[in-house]
Amino acid sequence: MPLVPLKPFKVPRRAAASQVSQSAIIPAPVGGLNYRDPISAMDPRDALVLTNLIPGQQGVELRRGWAEFADAVEVSGAPQSVEAVFSYKAPSSANDKVFMAANGNIYDVTAGGTPTVAVTGTGSTADEWWTTQFSTAADTFLLAVSPGAGYWTYSTTSGWVNRTGTVTGMTTSVRTVMVWKRRVWFTFANSPNVYYMNAVDAITGTVTSFPMGSLLRNGGYVSAMVNWTTDAGISVDDYLVVIGTEGDVGVWQGTDPTSAATFELKGVWYVGPVPLRGRYFTTFGGDVMIVSQLGLVPMSRLFTGQFSADNQNVGPAAKIQTVFAPLVRSLRDQKFWNVFVVPSSDVLVISLPVDGDVYRQFAMNVTTGAWCSFEGMPIRSAAVIGGELYFGQANGTTCKGLSGDLDGLAIDNTGGSYVLGEVQCAFNAFGAPGQLKKFSLARPIFFGPAAPSAQLTINTQYAFNDTAGAPAFSDPGASVWGSGIWSQAVWLTNNSYEGWFGTAALGYYGSLRMKLRGLPGTSFLSAHVLSEMGGVM
Protein backbone atom coordinates (compact mmCIF):
# COMPACT_ATOMS: atom_id res chain seq x y z
CA MET A 1 0.00 0.00 0.00
CA PRO A 2 1.53 3.28 -1.07
CA LEU A 3 2.31 5.88 1.54
CA VAL A 4 0.01 8.83 1.70
CA PRO A 5 1.58 12.16 2.55
CA LEU A 6 0.23 13.97 5.60
CA LYS A 7 -1.92 16.96 5.01
CA PRO A 8 -0.15 20.12 6.02
CA PHE A 9 -1.17 21.91 9.21
CA LYS A 10 -3.43 19.07 10.40
CA VAL A 11 -3.73 19.04 14.21
CA PRO A 12 -3.19 15.60 15.70
CA ARG A 13 -6.24 14.19 17.50
CA ARG A 14 -6.03 14.53 21.28
CA ALA A 15 -7.64 12.53 24.04
CA ALA A 16 -10.41 14.27 26.01
CA ALA A 17 -9.19 16.02 29.17
CA SER A 18 -10.12 14.26 32.40
CA GLN A 19 -12.55 15.96 34.76
CA VAL A 20 -10.81 17.38 37.83
CA SER A 21 -13.73 19.07 39.63
CA GLN A 22 -16.36 17.17 41.58
CA SER A 23 -19.82 18.29 42.59
CA ALA A 24 -21.42 17.55 45.96
CA ILE A 25 -24.67 18.57 47.60
CA ILE A 26 -25.15 20.29 50.95
CA PRO A 27 -28.68 19.72 52.27
CA ALA A 28 -30.62 22.44 54.05
CA PRO A 29 -30.10 22.21 57.84
CA VAL A 30 -33.65 21.05 58.56
CA GLY A 31 -32.36 19.40 61.75
CA GLY A 32 -31.75 22.86 63.18
CA LEU A 33 -29.07 24.04 65.58
CA ASN A 34 -26.81 21.39 67.07
CA TYR A 35 -24.54 22.37 69.95
CA ARG A 36 -24.51 18.82 71.34
CA ASP A 37 -22.70 16.57 68.87
CA PRO A 38 -18.98 16.65 67.99
CA ILE A 39 -18.24 19.14 65.24
CA SER A 40 -16.35 16.43 63.36
CA ALA A 41 -19.25 13.95 63.34
CA MET A 42 -22.36 16.06 62.93
CA ASP A 43 -25.38 15.17 60.82
CA PRO A 44 -25.07 17.16 57.55
CA ARG A 45 -28.70 18.24 58.03
CA ASP A 46 -27.80 20.13 61.22
CA ALA A 47 -26.45 23.65 61.61
CA LEU A 48 -23.76 25.36 63.66
CA VAL A 49 -25.34 28.78 63.09
CA LEU A 50 -29.01 29.28 62.21
CA THR A 51 -30.29 32.79 62.84
CA ASN A 52 -33.69 34.11 61.74
CA LEU A 53 -34.19 31.00 59.59
CA ILE A 54 -36.87 28.61 60.84
CA PRO A 55 -36.09 24.95 60.06
CA GLY A 56 -38.98 23.23 58.32
CA GLN A 57 -39.43 19.86 56.68
CA GLN A 58 -38.06 20.88 53.26
CA GLY A 59 -35.76 23.80 54.04
CA VAL A 60 -35.05 26.71 56.38
CA GLU A 61 -37.33 29.72 55.98
CA LEU A 62 -36.79 33.41 56.76
CA ARG A 63 -38.92 34.51 59.70
CA ARG A 64 -41.37 37.37 59.38
CA GLY A 65 -40.52 40.85 60.64
CA TRP A 66 -41.88 43.14 63.35
CA ALA A 67 -43.47 46.58 63.39
CA GLU A 68 -44.47 49.21 65.91
CA PHE A 69 -48.16 48.98 66.79
CA ALA A 70 -48.71 51.60 69.51
CA ASP A 71 -46.87 54.85 70.19
CA ALA A 72 -44.38 55.21 73.01
CA VAL A 73 -45.51 56.12 76.50
CA GLU A 74 -43.54 59.15 77.68
CA VAL A 75 -43.23 61.12 80.91
CA SER A 76 -41.74 64.60 80.53
CA GLY A 77 -40.44 63.55 77.13
CA ALA A 78 -38.72 60.40 78.44
CA PRO A 79 -39.97 57.04 77.08
CA GLN A 80 -41.22 54.56 79.68
CA SER A 81 -40.33 50.91 79.15
CA VAL A 82 -43.22 48.53 78.45
CA GLU A 83 -42.90 45.97 81.26
CA ALA A 84 -45.97 43.80 80.53
CA VAL A 85 -48.37 43.07 77.67
CA PHE A 86 -51.62 41.16 78.23
CA SER A 87 -55.10 40.80 76.78
CA TYR A 88 -58.78 40.33 77.54
CA LYS A 89 -60.85 37.96 75.40
CA ALA A 90 -64.49 39.01 75.63
CA PRO A 91 -67.58 36.91 74.79
CA SER A 92 -67.98 39.28 71.85
CA SER A 93 -64.81 39.87 69.83
CA ALA A 94 -65.82 43.51 69.43
CA ASN A 95 -64.94 43.98 73.12
CA ASP A 96 -61.53 42.27 73.04
CA LYS A 97 -58.73 44.32 74.59
CA VAL A 98 -54.94 44.58 74.46
CA PHE A 99 -53.31 46.18 77.50
CA MET A 100 -49.77 47.06 78.47
CA ALA A 101 -48.18 48.26 81.70
CA ALA A 102 -45.60 51.02 82.12
CA ASN A 103 -44.69 53.66 84.68
CA GLY A 104 -47.12 52.27 87.29
CA ASN A 105 -50.11 52.56 84.95
CA ILE A 106 -52.13 50.26 82.70
CA TYR A 107 -52.76 51.42 79.13
CA ASP A 108 -55.27 50.31 76.50
CA VAL A 109 -53.49 49.77 73.16
CA THR A 110 -56.21 47.74 71.44
CA ALA A 111 -56.56 50.13 68.52
CA GLY A 112 -52.84 50.83 68.19
CA GLY A 113 -51.60 54.38 67.78
CA THR A 114 -51.74 56.54 70.90
CA PRO A 115 -52.14 54.51 74.13
CA THR A 116 -55.11 55.33 76.37
CA VAL A 117 -54.66 55.31 80.14
CA ALA A 118 -56.91 52.60 81.61
CA VAL A 119 -55.67 52.68 85.23
CA THR A 120 -53.54 55.39 86.82
CA GLY A 121 -51.27 54.62 89.75
CA THR A 122 -51.71 50.88 90.23
CA GLY A 123 -49.00 50.79 92.88
CA SER A 124 -47.08 48.06 91.08
CA THR A 125 -43.45 48.11 92.14
CA ALA A 126 -42.03 46.87 88.81
CA ASP A 127 -45.03 46.73 86.44
CA GLU A 128 -44.67 42.93 86.24
CA TRP A 129 -48.22 41.64 85.82
CA TRP A 130 -49.48 38.05 85.79
CA THR A 131 -52.89 37.49 84.22
CA THR A 132 -55.44 34.80 83.41
CA GLN A 133 -59.09 34.69 82.32
CA PHE A 134 -62.01 33.32 84.35
CA SER A 135 -65.70 33.15 83.52
CA THR A 136 -68.46 33.02 86.12
CA ALA A 137 -72.22 33.12 85.81
CA ALA A 138 -72.00 36.88 86.28
CA ASP A 139 -69.35 37.85 83.72
CA THR A 140 -66.09 37.04 81.94
CA PHE A 141 -63.12 38.47 83.84
CA LEU A 142 -59.45 39.15 83.31
CA LEU A 143 -57.67 38.46 86.61
CA ALA A 144 -54.45 40.42 87.04
CA VAL A 145 -51.94 40.54 89.90
CA SER A 146 -48.68 42.39 90.47
CA PRO A 147 -46.47 42.86 93.56
CA GLY A 148 -47.29 46.25 95.03
CA ALA A 149 -50.52 46.60 93.06
CA GLY A 150 -52.35 43.58 94.48
CA TYR A 151 -55.31 41.84 92.85
CA TRP A 152 -57.31 43.49 90.04
CA THR A 153 -60.03 42.37 87.63
CA TYR A 154 -61.30 43.64 84.31
CA SER A 155 -64.53 42.95 82.43
CA THR A 156 -66.47 44.73 79.71
CA THR A 157 -69.25 45.46 82.20
CA SER A 158 -67.30 46.69 85.23
CA GLY A 159 -63.99 47.81 83.73
CA TRP A 160 -60.90 47.73 85.96
CA VAL A 161 -61.57 47.07 89.67
CA ASN A 162 -59.03 46.80 92.50
CA ARG A 163 -60.14 43.73 94.49
CA THR A 164 -57.24 43.64 96.97
CA GLY A 165 -59.10 45.18 99.88
CA THR A 166 -62.32 43.24 99.27
CA VAL A 167 -60.77 39.75 99.45
CA THR A 168 -60.04 38.48 102.95
CA GLY A 169 -56.46 37.25 103.22
CA MET A 170 -55.30 39.07 100.08
CA THR A 171 -52.25 41.36 100.21
CA THR A 172 -50.33 43.48 97.73
CA SER A 173 -47.50 40.92 97.75
CA VAL A 174 -49.54 38.62 95.50
CA ARG A 175 -47.36 37.51 92.59
CA THR A 176 -49.14 35.04 90.27
CA VAL A 177 -52.72 33.95 89.58
CA MET A 178 -54.22 30.91 87.85
CA VAL A 179 -57.44 28.89 87.71
CA TRP A 180 -57.73 25.19 88.57
CA LYS A 181 -60.89 23.13 89.03
CA ARG A 182 -63.12 26.24 89.02
CA ARG A 183 -61.10 27.91 91.79
CA VAL A 184 -58.81 30.92 91.60
CA TRP A 185 -55.33 30.22 93.00
CA PHE A 186 -52.50 32.62 93.91
CA THR A 187 -48.85 32.64 94.91
CA PHE A 188 -47.31 35.38 97.02
CA ALA A 189 -43.78 36.77 96.80
CA ASN A 190 -41.17 34.69 98.67
CA SER A 191 -43.82 32.39 100.18
CA PRO A 192 -43.66 28.56 100.43
CA ASN A 193 -47.47 28.48 100.49
CA VAL A 194 -50.11 28.73 97.81
CA TYR A 195 -53.49 30.40 98.26
CA TYR A 196 -56.93 29.53 96.90
CA MET A 197 -60.34 31.14 96.85
CA ASN A 198 -62.60 29.27 99.28
CA ALA A 199 -65.61 29.32 96.98
CA VAL A 200 -65.67 27.86 93.48
CA ASP A 201 -66.67 30.07 90.54
CA ALA A 202 -65.85 33.17 92.60
CA ILE A 203 -63.45 36.05 92.09
CA THR A 204 -63.95 37.53 95.57
CA GLY A 205 -64.43 36.17 99.09
CA THR A 206 -61.73 34.64 101.26
CA VAL A 207 -58.39 33.14 100.29
CA THR A 208 -56.92 30.32 102.35
CA SER A 209 -53.27 29.31 102.45
CA PHE A 210 -52.10 25.78 101.68
CA PRO A 211 -48.54 24.87 102.76
CA MET A 212 -46.24 23.54 100.02
CA GLY A 213 -42.98 23.73 101.97
CA SER A 214 -42.74 19.94 102.28
CA LEU A 215 -42.32 19.51 98.53
CA LEU A 216 -39.63 22.22 98.31
CA ARG A 217 -36.85 19.76 99.09
CA ASN A 218 -34.19 22.04 97.61
CA GLY A 219 -35.46 25.14 99.37
CA GLY A 220 -36.70 28.37 97.85
CA TYR A 221 -40.35 29.34 97.54
CA VAL A 222 -43.30 28.60 95.27
CA SER A 223 -42.67 30.35 91.97
CA ALA A 224 -45.81 29.56 89.99
CA MET A 225 -48.63 27.09 89.36
CA VAL A 226 -50.05 25.78 86.11
CA ASN A 227 -52.96 23.57 85.05
CA TRP A 228 -51.91 20.39 83.21
CA THR A 229 -54.51 18.33 81.38
CA THR A 230 -53.39 14.75 80.71
CA ASP A 231 -54.63 11.17 80.92
CA ALA A 232 -51.54 9.97 82.86
CA GLY A 233 -52.24 6.48 81.53
CA ILE A 234 -55.53 6.21 83.45
CA SER A 235 -58.10 8.83 82.50
CA VAL A 236 -58.12 12.44 81.40
CA ASP A 237 -57.85 14.83 84.33
CA ASP A 238 -56.61 18.29 85.23
CA TYR A 239 -53.56 18.23 87.49
CA LEU A 240 -52.22 21.13 89.54
CA VAL A 241 -48.49 21.61 88.90
CA VAL A 242 -46.66 23.57 91.61
CA ILE A 243 -43.16 24.81 90.69
CA GLY A 244 -40.54 25.80 93.26
CA THR A 245 -37.80 28.29 92.49
CA GLU A 246 -35.02 25.72 93.07
CA GLY A 247 -36.52 23.18 90.68
CA ASP A 248 -38.89 21.06 92.77
CA VAL A 249 -42.13 20.30 90.93
CA GLY A 250 -45.14 18.83 92.73
CA VAL A 251 -48.16 17.39 90.93
CA TRP A 252 -51.52 17.36 92.72
CA GLN A 253 -54.75 15.61 91.78
CA GLY A 254 -58.26 16.08 93.10
CA THR A 255 -60.93 18.72 93.35
CA ASP A 256 -61.22 20.25 96.82
CA PRO A 257 -58.06 21.35 98.67
CA THR A 258 -59.99 21.57 101.96
CA SER A 259 -60.11 17.77 102.26
CA ALA A 260 -57.28 15.22 102.10
CA ALA A 261 -59.79 12.76 100.62
CA THR A 262 -60.25 14.96 97.56
CA PHE A 263 -56.77 16.46 97.16
CA GLU A 264 -53.59 14.38 97.01
CA LEU A 265 -49.96 14.75 96.01
CA LYS A 266 -49.05 12.42 93.12
CA GLY A 267 -45.32 13.01 93.34
CA VAL A 268 -42.40 15.44 93.40
CA TRP A 269 -39.81 15.72 90.62
CA TYR A 270 -36.71 17.83 90.04
CA VAL A 271 -36.17 20.00 86.95
CA GLY A 272 -33.30 22.21 88.08
CA PRO A 273 -33.49 25.86 89.18
CA VAL A 274 -35.97 27.93 87.17
CA PRO A 275 -35.91 31.64 86.23
CA LEU A 276 -37.01 33.84 89.12
CA ARG A 277 -38.98 36.37 87.06
CA GLY A 278 -41.28 36.19 84.09
CA ARG A 279 -43.44 33.46 82.58
CA TYR A 280 -40.90 30.70 81.98
CA PHE A 281 -43.33 27.94 81.01
CA THR A 282 -46.15 27.35 78.55
CA THR A 283 -48.81 24.78 77.76
CA PHE A 284 -48.44 23.14 74.39
CA GLY A 285 -49.99 20.08 72.75
CA GLY A 286 -51.40 18.63 75.98
CA ASP A 287 -48.11 19.18 77.77
CA VAL A 288 -46.48 21.75 80.03
CA MET A 289 -43.02 22.94 78.97
CA ILE A 290 -40.84 24.37 81.76
CA VAL A 291 -37.59 26.28 81.20
CA SER A 292 -34.91 25.42 83.73
CA GLN A 293 -31.18 24.89 83.99
CA LEU A 294 -31.79 21.38 82.63
CA GLY A 295 -33.26 22.81 79.43
CA LEU A 296 -36.86 22.74 78.27
CA VAL A 297 -38.56 20.12 80.42
CA PRO A 298 -41.83 18.50 79.26
CA MET A 299 -44.04 17.45 82.19
CA SER A 300 -45.22 14.35 80.33
CA ARG A 301 -41.68 12.91 80.17
CA LEU A 302 -40.87 14.02 83.70
CA PHE A 303 -44.03 12.37 85.04
CA THR A 304 -43.27 9.05 83.31
CA GLY A 305 -39.59 8.98 84.26
CA GLN A 306 -38.24 9.55 80.74
CA PHE A 307 -36.59 12.86 81.72
CA SER A 308 -34.31 13.41 84.69
CA ALA A 309 -31.21 15.34 85.71
CA ASP A 310 -29.17 12.29 84.66
CA ASN A 311 -31.00 11.77 81.36
CA GLN A 312 -31.40 15.13 79.65
CA ASN A 313 -30.79 13.92 76.09
CA VAL A 314 -34.46 13.01 75.69
CA GLY A 315 -35.57 16.60 76.25
CA PRO A 316 -36.76 18.75 73.35
CA ALA A 317 -33.88 21.20 73.91
CA ALA A 318 -31.15 18.52 74.07
CA LYS A 319 -29.36 19.77 70.93
CA ILE A 320 -29.03 23.35 72.25
CA GLN A 321 -28.55 22.48 75.93
CA THR A 322 -24.82 23.21 76.14
CA VAL A 323 -25.44 26.84 75.12
CA PHE A 324 -28.91 27.29 76.61
CA ALA A 325 -28.21 26.05 80.16
CA PRO A 326 -25.42 28.59 80.88
CA LEU A 327 -27.74 31.37 79.69
CA VAL A 328 -30.44 30.23 82.13
CA ARG A 329 -27.88 30.29 84.95
CA SER A 330 -26.47 33.71 84.11
CA LEU A 331 -29.82 35.41 83.39
CA ARG A 332 -31.94 33.56 85.94
CA ASP A 333 -32.71 36.55 88.16
CA GLN A 334 -33.37 38.99 85.30
CA LYS A 335 -36.78 40.26 84.21
CA PHE A 336 -38.58 39.31 81.01
CA TRP A 337 -38.33 35.55 80.63
CA ASN A 338 -41.09 34.63 78.21
CA VAL A 339 -42.11 31.29 76.69
CA PHE A 340 -44.93 31.22 74.14
CA VAL A 341 -46.22 29.48 71.02
CA VAL A 342 -46.90 31.50 67.84
CA PRO A 343 -49.28 29.37 65.73
CA SER A 344 -48.91 31.50 62.59
CA SER A 345 -45.19 30.67 62.41
CA ASP A 346 -45.41 27.14 63.90
CA VAL A 347 -42.81 27.96 66.55
CA LEU A 348 -42.39 27.74 70.29
CA VAL A 349 -40.27 30.71 71.36
CA ILE A 350 -38.10 31.10 74.45
CA SER A 351 -37.40 34.81 74.80
CA LEU A 352 -34.41 35.54 77.02
CA PRO A 353 -33.94 38.70 79.11
CA VAL A 354 -31.89 41.37 77.40
CA ASP A 355 -28.19 40.71 78.00
CA GLY A 356 -26.43 44.06 77.88
CA ASP A 357 -27.97 45.40 74.70
CA VAL A 358 -28.43 41.99 73.05
CA TYR A 359 -31.93 40.62 72.50
CA ARG A 360 -32.06 36.93 71.68
CA GLN A 361 -34.67 34.22 71.35
CA PHE A 362 -34.53 30.48 70.70
CA ALA A 363 -37.33 29.10 68.52
CA MET A 364 -38.40 25.49 68.01
CA ASN A 365 -40.45 24.26 65.06
CA VAL A 366 -43.41 22.66 66.82
CA THR A 367 -43.76 20.05 64.06
CA THR A 368 -40.16 18.88 63.68
CA GLY A 369 -38.64 19.87 67.03
CA ALA A 370 -35.70 21.58 65.28
CA TRP A 371 -34.23 24.77 66.78
CA CYS A 372 -32.99 28.11 65.48
CA SER A 373 -32.30 31.48 67.08
CA PHE A 374 -33.87 34.88 66.47
CA GLU A 375 -31.99 38.16 66.55
CA GLY A 376 -33.12 41.68 65.76
CA MET A 377 -36.42 41.47 67.69
CA PRO A 378 -36.11 43.65 70.84
CA ILE A 379 -38.65 41.69 72.90
CA ARG A 380 -38.92 42.90 76.49
CA SER A 381 -42.36 41.66 77.52
CA ALA A 382 -44.54 39.53 75.28
CA ALA A 383 -47.95 37.90 74.86
CA VAL A 384 -49.70 35.97 72.11
CA ILE A 385 -53.12 37.48 71.52
CA GLY A 386 -55.50 36.01 68.98
CA GLY A 387 -52.64 33.99 67.51
CA GLU A 388 -50.52 37.14 67.00
CA LEU A 389 -47.37 38.07 68.91
CA TYR A 390 -47.36 41.43 70.71
CA PHE A 391 -44.33 42.69 72.60
CA GLY A 392 -43.15 45.76 74.44
CA GLN A 393 -39.90 47.64 73.95
CA ALA A 394 -37.63 49.58 76.25
CA ASN A 395 -38.41 52.69 74.17
CA GLY A 396 -42.07 52.59 75.27
CA THR A 397 -43.64 51.27 72.06
CA THR A 398 -45.83 48.19 71.73
CA CYS A 399 -45.09 46.08 68.65
CA LYS A 400 -46.42 43.21 66.59
CA GLY A 401 -43.87 40.46 66.05
CA LEU A 402 -43.47 37.77 63.39
CA SER A 403 -45.71 39.88 61.20
CA GLY A 404 -44.95 41.79 58.01
CA ASP A 405 -41.92 41.94 55.74
CA LEU A 406 -39.60 44.33 57.61
CA ASP A 407 -37.84 44.48 60.97
CA GLY A 408 -38.41 47.73 62.86
CA LEU A 409 -41.11 49.27 60.69
CA ALA A 410 -42.22 52.51 62.37
CA ILE A 411 -45.82 53.18 63.22
CA ASP A 412 -46.00 55.65 60.30
CA ASN A 413 -44.82 52.86 57.95
CA THR A 414 -41.36 54.37 57.49
CA GLY A 415 -37.95 52.84 58.10
CA GLY A 416 -37.39 49.19 58.75
CA SER A 417 -35.07 46.68 57.09
CA TYR A 418 -35.49 43.29 55.52
CA VAL A 419 -34.82 40.35 57.81
CA LEU A 420 -31.21 39.14 57.73
CA GLY A 421 -30.83 35.37 57.95
CA GLU A 422 -27.56 33.59 58.63
CA VAL A 423 -26.59 29.93 58.43
CA GLN A 424 -23.49 27.81 58.81
CA CYS A 425 -24.08 24.20 57.87
CA ALA A 426 -22.36 21.22 59.47
CA PHE A 427 -18.79 20.49 58.36
CA ASN A 428 -18.71 17.88 55.62
CA ALA A 429 -15.86 15.69 54.30
CA PHE A 430 -17.85 14.93 51.12
CA GLY A 431 -16.91 11.26 51.25
CA ALA A 432 -13.14 11.78 51.44
CA PRO A 433 -12.07 12.91 54.92
CA GLY A 434 -8.38 12.24 54.25
CA GLN A 435 -8.09 14.21 51.01
CA LEU A 436 -7.39 17.90 50.65
CA LYS A 437 -10.03 19.81 48.70
CA LYS A 438 -10.01 23.08 46.83
CA PHE A 439 -13.52 24.56 47.02
CA SER A 440 -14.02 26.88 44.08
CA LEU A 441 -17.76 27.41 43.59
CA ALA A 442 -21.03 27.06 45.50
CA ARG A 443 -24.59 27.30 44.20
CA PRO A 444 -27.36 27.78 46.80
CA ILE A 445 -30.94 27.01 45.78
CA PHE A 446 -33.85 29.02 47.18
CA PHE A 447 -37.62 28.92 46.93
CA GLY A 448 -39.74 31.97 47.60
CA PRO A 449 -41.81 34.89 46.32
CA ALA A 450 -38.75 36.78 44.99
CA ALA A 451 -35.06 36.15 44.42
CA PRO A 452 -33.18 36.82 47.67
CA SER A 453 -29.79 38.49 47.98
CA ALA A 454 -27.01 36.35 49.43
CA GLN A 455 -23.34 36.37 50.33
CA LEU A 456 -21.48 33.20 51.19
CA THR A 457 -18.15 31.56 51.83
CA ILE A 458 -16.86 28.07 52.53
CA ASN A 459 -15.25 27.67 55.95
CA THR A 460 -12.66 24.92 56.28
CA GLN A 461 -10.83 23.21 59.14
CA TYR A 462 -13.66 23.94 61.63
CA ALA A 463 -13.47 27.72 61.24
CA PHE A 464 -16.39 30.06 61.92
CA ASN A 465 -15.36 32.96 59.70
CA ASP A 466 -18.14 35.38 58.82
CA THR A 467 -19.02 36.46 55.30
CA ALA A 468 -17.66 39.78 54.07
CA GLY A 469 -20.47 42.20 54.88
CA ALA A 470 -24.20 41.63 54.57
CA PRO A 471 -26.27 41.47 51.38
CA ALA A 472 -28.59 44.27 50.32
CA PHE A 473 -32.11 43.47 49.14
CA SER A 474 -34.69 45.52 47.28
CA ASP A 475 -38.26 44.31 47.02
CA PRO A 476 -39.08 43.93 43.30
CA GLY A 477 -42.66 44.85 44.10
CA ALA A 478 -45.75 43.41 42.49
CA SER A 479 -47.97 44.79 39.77
CA VAL A 480 -51.67 45.46 40.23
CA TRP A 481 -54.04 43.80 37.76
CA GLY A 482 -55.42 46.36 35.35
CA SER A 483 -52.55 48.81 35.79
CA GLY A 484 -49.47 46.68 35.06
CA ILE A 485 -47.85 46.85 31.62
CA TRP A 486 -48.01 43.60 29.69
CA SER A 487 -44.61 41.84 29.36
CA GLN A 488 -43.13 44.29 31.91
CA ALA A 489 -45.28 43.74 34.99
CA VAL A 490 -43.90 41.68 37.88
CA TRP A 491 -46.19 39.07 39.42
CA LEU A 492 -44.88 37.74 42.73
CA THR A 493 -45.34 33.99 42.88
CA ASN A 494 -43.22 31.37 44.58
CA ASN A 495 -40.42 30.17 42.36
CA SER A 496 -36.98 28.58 42.67
CA TYR A 497 -33.80 30.68 42.40
CA GLU A 498 -30.13 29.72 42.19
CA GLY A 499 -26.74 31.17 41.31
CA TRP A 500 -23.02 30.36 41.43
CA PHE A 501 -20.72 32.07 43.95
CA GLY A 502 -16.92 31.92 44.01
CA THR A 503 -15.50 30.51 47.24
CA ALA A 504 -11.69 29.89 46.98
CA ALA A 505 -11.17 27.76 50.08
CA LEU A 506 -8.74 24.93 50.85
CA GLY A 507 -9.21 22.21 53.45
CA TYR A 508 -10.21 18.66 54.30
CA TYR A 509 -13.68 19.59 55.60
CA GLY A 510 -15.97 22.30 54.28
CA SER A 511 -18.93 24.17 55.77
CA LEU A 512 -21.20 26.60 53.93
CA ARG A 513 -21.54 29.97 55.70
CA MET A 514 -24.17 32.28 54.21
CA LYS A 515 -26.14 35.44 54.90
CA LEU A 516 -29.30 36.26 53.00
CA ARG A 517 -32.03 38.88 52.86
CA GLY A 518 -35.37 38.52 51.17
CA LEU A 519 -39.09 38.42 51.65
CA PRO A 520 -40.58 36.29 54.43
CA GLY A 521 -41.34 32.82 53.15
CA THR A 522 -38.03 32.58 51.30
CA SER A 523 -36.50 29.15 51.96
CA PHE A 524 -32.96 27.85 51.54
CA LEU A 525 -33.35 24.31 50.16
CA SER A 526 -29.82 23.07 49.39
CA ALA A 527 -26.50 23.99 47.80
CA HIS A 528 -24.12 22.43 45.31
CA VAL A 529 -20.39 22.72 45.93
CA LEU A 530 -17.71 22.35 43.25
CA SER A 531 -14.28 21.24 44.45
CA GLU A 532 -11.03 19.69 43.22
CA MET A 533 -9.68 16.69 45.10
CA GLY A 534 -6.04 16.62 46.10
CA GLY A 535 -3.85 14.24 48.01
CA VAL A 536 -3.50 13.50 51.68
CA MET A 537 -0.71 16.07 52.07
Question: Which positions does each model-derived feature cover?
Answer:
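Beta-sheet repeat architectures centered on beta-propellers
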Residues: P2-T114, T122-A138, V271-D287, Q293-M537
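A short beta-strand motif characteristic of beta-propeller blades
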Residues: F69-G77, P115-T122, W160-V167, F210-L216, ...
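Structural signature of WD-repeat beta-propellers
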Residues: A101-A102, S146-P147, F188-A189, G244-T245, ...
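Beta-strand initiation motifs
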Residues: G113-V117, S158-N162, A202-T208, P257-K266, ...
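Asp-box/WD-like beta-propeller blade repeats and closely related beta-sheet repeat scaffolds
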Residues: T156-W180
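Solenoidal tandem-repeat scaffolds enriched in leucines and small polar residues
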Residues: V177-S223, W228-I234
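Beta-propeller blade signature
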Residues: V200, E246-D248, Q361-N365
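Surface-exposed extracellular loop regions of Gram-negative outer-membrane beta-barrel proteins
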Residues: D238, V242-V271
